[in-house]
């Protein structure tokens, strides 16, 4: 009790002006709004449609146990040792083969580096490619943590709107022409083309190919983030942009977080060896190497065919939850509310009538027992207030229905004002 009291006193009345020791960049850092929101609802009776968490029921616990036992019996010396910065070679070989077979991407182990989740990959891309003032194109809306990772390196963000077919490349072309007239050029276009986070939409094949043409014409690189691509519940698959990349302009990001388990913190970058080499050097000073033990388990998971067998089970588990959310939205939402109808992934994006600020409305929703992520944080310029992201993978169908019902009641009350 005495220790708890002292800790509380230190928090309430700090003995130093700690702020003065932080760098200017550190002072500019802001906590993830989603992470802070999750703290708010994690211990309450609130139905949370806010997080981006995979359902624990989809974790292949039994398989992981068997693989872990085998790794400790046969590969302990490697698995428990430091590894190379570029990654565990057998895993990189297995990933290259998997991407060739799955996506028809001509790739080898020299094109792949493992990372501590794809979030680290985003930070490394910022370190290696972004100078202050560089123009980075992002989708509007886009992945909040990508904005956080890139913002640290002080780029200028340009937003391109999404529609039901993903990034509007016609508007992108207009913006590229406009910037060219001003003597400016884009360095990176960051996109989540398949089951986009937060919107859930998918870029069609025609737009993917056109984006590559624009990259060549205007000399920029594409960062293709694909954490959700395997989670397809309906519709026809679309190849990654990387599959048509003949010039080596696409830096592809993959992750095991949604197809194995996020706790392993294993992602990978697939790119031209020239890019990989510089990213590898940047990673050396960050964490020396990605968790070797996790990499060896991931290798066995891919090599043993468990990955391809497990993905359909994840899809079978999530599809009813996606369907339950779409059905509940149709049943309960008032006129004037619109939402996306994703063919896969983890999220639905809702747009409310103009004048409703979903960030201000959140407290009222939580009071009714439901949480969501306000959409403002997903825009680089934070200029859209009437949107929200809803997650359907973590909560059971019956709670999804009840959560949407509570949310609709909150929205109806706001619309009466």
UniProtKB/Swiss-Prot annotation:
SUPFAM superfamilies on file: PLP-dependent transferases
Transferase keyword on record: yes
Record note on temperature dependence: Optimum temperature is 95-100 degrees Celsius.
InterPro entries given in the database record: Aminotransferase_I/II_large, Class-I_PLP-dep_aminotransf, PyrdxlP-dep_Trfase, PyrdxlP-dep_Trfase_major, PyrdxlP-dep_Trfase_small
Keywords for this protein: Aminotransferase, Pyridoxal phosphate, Transferase
Cleaved signal peptide residues: none
Reaction(s) catalysed (UniProt annotation): an aromatic L-alpha-amino acid + 2-oxoglutarate = an aromatic oxo-acid + L-glutamate
Biological process per Gene Ontology, one example term: biosynthetic process
Coiled coil stretches, renumbered: none
Transmembrane domains' residue ranges: none
Named cofactor requirement(s): pyridoxal 5'-phosphate
Gene Ontology terms, MF aspect: aromatic-amino-acid transaminase activity; pyridoxal phosphate binding
Function field: Catalyzes the transamination of phenylalanine, tyrosine and tryptophan. Shows virtually no activity towards aspartic acid, alanine, valine or isoleucine.
Family: Belongs to the class-I pyridoxal-phosphate-dependent aminotransferase family.
Subunit description: Homodimer.
Name this protein carries in UniProt: Aromatic-amino-acid aminotransferase 1
Organism phylogeny: Archaea, Methanobacteriati, Methanobacteriota, Thermococci, Thermococcales
């Amino acid at each position: 009790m005495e220790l708890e009291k002292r800790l509380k006193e230190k928090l309430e009345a700090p003995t130093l002006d700690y702020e003065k020791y932080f760098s200017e960049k550190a002072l500019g850092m802001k906590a993830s709004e989603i992470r802070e929101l999750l703290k708010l609802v994690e211990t309450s009776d609130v139905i949370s449609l806010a997080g981006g968490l995979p359902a624990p029921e989809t974790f292949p616990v039994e398989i992981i146990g068997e693989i872990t036992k085998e790794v400790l019996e046969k590969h302990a010396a490697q698995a428990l040792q430091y590894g190379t910065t570029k990654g565990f070679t057998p895993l990189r070989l297995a990933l290259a083969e998997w991407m060739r077979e799955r996506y028809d991407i001509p790739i080898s182990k020299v094109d792949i580096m493992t990372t501590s989740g794809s979030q680290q990959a985003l930070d490394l891309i910022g370190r290696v490619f972004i100078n202050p003032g560089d123009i980075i194109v992002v989708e509007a809306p886009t992945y909040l943590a990508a904005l956080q990772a890139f913002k640290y390196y002080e780029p200028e963000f340009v937003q391109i709107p999404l529609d039901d077919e993903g990034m509007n490349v016609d508007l992108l072309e207009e913006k590229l022409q406009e910037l060219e007239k001003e003597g400016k050029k884009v360095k990176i276009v960051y996109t989540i083309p398949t089951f986009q986070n937060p919107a859930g939409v998918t870029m069609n094949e025609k737009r993917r190919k056109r984006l590559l043409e624009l990259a060549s014409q205007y000399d920029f690189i594409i960062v293709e983030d694909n954490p959700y691509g395997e989670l397809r519940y309906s519709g026809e698959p679309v190849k990654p942009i990387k599959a048509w990349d003949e010039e080596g302009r696409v830096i592809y990001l993959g992750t095991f977080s949604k197809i194995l388990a996020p706790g392993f913190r294993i992602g990978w970058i697939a790119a031209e060896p020239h890019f990989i080499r510089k990213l590898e050097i940047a990673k050396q000073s960050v964490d020396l190497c990605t968790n070797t033990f996790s990499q060896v388990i991931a290798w066995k998971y891919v090599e043993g065919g468990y990955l391809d067998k497990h993905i359909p089970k994840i899809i079978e588990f999530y599809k009813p939850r996606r369907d339950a959310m779409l059905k509940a939205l149709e049943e309960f939402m008032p006129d004037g509310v619109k939402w996306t109808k994703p063919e896969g992934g983890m999220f639905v994006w809702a747009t409310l009538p103009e004048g409703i600020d979903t960030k201000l409305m959140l407290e009222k929703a939580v009071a009714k027992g439901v949480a969501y992520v306000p959409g403002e944080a997903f825009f680089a310029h934070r200029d859209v207030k009437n949107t929200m992201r809803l997650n359907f993978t973590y909560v059971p169908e019956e709670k999804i229905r009840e959560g949407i019902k509570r949310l609709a009641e909150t929205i109806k009350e706001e619309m009466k004002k």
